[in-house]
């Protein structure tokens, strides 16, 4: 889990971590994200999920759907593309999944159940999740309770601090 305010280097931290992993699929959504665009030549960018899936030998994939004419169309398009990808990964297994802006994916794109599923059952299917988020209280609880490694940037929001104090299932009052 990587949790920090916007502009604090979450994507840069993720890039460093993901280069240490094999078989990575990143879910990207910000049209003009210069940091993500600079991930490097070893990453293959996909604008859509291939109809017949991907070649399992493809090692580093950035699933980065196009922005549409308006916000509603963009969210609907992203939801469709990302949902087809998570369904395929569920069957294939053996991937590290990077979710950029997890709240956008779980909330606006409606992928909360799918991302929760990977946090509950992914390990037994050789799936690792790396989640980027700006606010810990806006993502499903299972993400916070299944964290094994965390990078946490500065926050002064009391609700966020309370959520972070329970990281890994530890009661903040203990």
What residues fall within each predicted segment?
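Walker A/P-loop NTP-binding active-site region of P-loop NTPases
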Residues: 8-49
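Structural motif
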Residues: 24-25, 60-62, 96
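Short loop/helix-cap segments at secondary-structure boundaries that form the rim of catalytic
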Residues: 33-40, 54-56, 140-145
């Amino acid at each position: 889990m990587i949790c920090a305010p916007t502009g604090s280097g979450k994507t840069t931290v993720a890039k460093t971590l993901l280069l240490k992993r094999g078989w990575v699929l990143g879910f990207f959504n910000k049209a003009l994200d210069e940091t993500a665009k600079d991930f490097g030549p070893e990453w293959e960018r996909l604008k859509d999920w291939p109809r017949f899936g991907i070649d399992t030998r493809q090692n580093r994939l950035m699933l980065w759907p196009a922005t549409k004419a308006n916000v509603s169309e963009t969210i609907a398009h992203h939801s469709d593309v990302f949902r087809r990808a998570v369904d395929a990964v569920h069957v294939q297994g053996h991937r590290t999944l990077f979710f950029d802006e997890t709240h956008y994916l779980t909330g606006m794109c409606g992928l909360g159940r799918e991302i929760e599923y990977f946090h509950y059952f992914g390990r037994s299917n050789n799936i690792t999740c790396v989640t980027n988020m700006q606010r810990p209280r806006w993502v499903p609880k299972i993400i916070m309770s299944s964290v094994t490694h965390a990078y946490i940037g500065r926050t002064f929001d009391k609700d966020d601090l309370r959520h972070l104090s329970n990281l890994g299932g530890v009661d903040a009052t203990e």
